[in-house]
Amino acid sequence: MIPQTLEQLLSQAQSIAGLTFGELADELHIPVPIDLKRDKGWVGMLLERALGATAGSKAEQDFSHLGVELKTLPINAEGYPLETTFVSLAPLVQNSGVKWENSHVRHKLSCVLWMPIEGSRHIPLRERHIGAPIFWKPTAEQERQLKQDWEELMDLIVLGKLDQITARIGEVMQLRPKGANSRAVTKGIGKNGEIIDTLPLGFYLRKEFTAQILNAFLETKSL
C-alpha cells in the first residue's frame, strides 16, 4: 500500500519496527540472502517494499508525493552509526548555475524518514532487527553546515580541482568515489576546463552527523 499522508507513512513504519529482517521478508515473500556482500541494496529494497516507496532508483525522493526520502541507518550495539550515508551523486559536468537551494542534496535531505537497523555483522541477516522510525528535517544549524560543505565541495568540482578532493574535506558531509568498482568512469572538468574521464563522486553524510540525529530523537523520547 502506498501511503497517502505522512501519518500513514509513519504508522506503517512504526508497524514494522521491532521485526527482524527475516520476519518482514517472509511476510512479503522476499528471499533473504545469506549476507549483503552481493546484495548491498537488499535492506533498502525490503523497507521500500514494506513501506510502499515509489521512486525506485530514480533521482527523486522515495516518497516524492509526500516530499520524503527513506534512509536506512545501520547501527551497532551502542546505537552508533556504522557507516556514512549516501545522499546523491555529485554533478561533475553541466553544473554552472547550480545553487544549494536547487541542489539534489538539499532536495533529498529536506525531509527524511530514517529507519535505524541492526548492522553488526556477527548478527545473521535474518535475525537483525528494524528500529523505531525517525522523521527528520534539518535544523537551521544543520542546514547551514550542509550548505557550507556542499558549496565548498562544489567549488572544487566547478573549478576543475577534482584531484584536490579528499574524504577529509567537509564538516558534516564528504565527497567520495561512488561506483561498484574503480573501473566505473564518468565525465568531469579538468584543471584547464577540459572534459576528462574521472570516477563518479557521491555526497555522503558523516557518521557524526547521523549520530547527532539519532541522539536528538532519543532525547525527545526520554523527556
Swiss-Prot record:
One biological process GO term for this chain? DNA modification
Molecular function via GO: DNA binding; endonuclease activity
**Family matches, as Gene3D superfamilies:** DNA mismatch repair MutH/Restriction endonuclease, type II (3.40.600.10)
Query: Is Acyltransferase one of the keywords?
Result: no
Q: Which UniProt keywords apply?
A: Cytoplasm, DNA damage, DNA repair, Endonuclease, Hydrolase, Nuclease
One of the record's GO cellular component terms: cytoplasm
Q: Name one Pfam family in it.
A: MutH
- Indicate whether DNA repair appears among the record's keywords: yes
Q: Which SMART domains match?
A: MutH
Q: Where in the cell is it found?
A: Cytoplasm
Q: Which NCBIfam families does the entry link to?
A: mutH_TIGR (TIGR02248), PRK05070.1 (NF003458)
Q: Which family does it belong to?
A: Belongs to the MutH family.
The role this protein plays is: Sequence-specific endonuclease that cleaves unmethylated GATC sequences. It is involved in DNA mismatch repair.
Q: What is this protein called?
A: DNA mismatch repair protein MutH
Q: Which lineage do the record's taxonomy fields give for this organism? A: Bacteria, Pseudomonadati, Pseudomonadota, Gammaproteobacteria, Pasteurellales
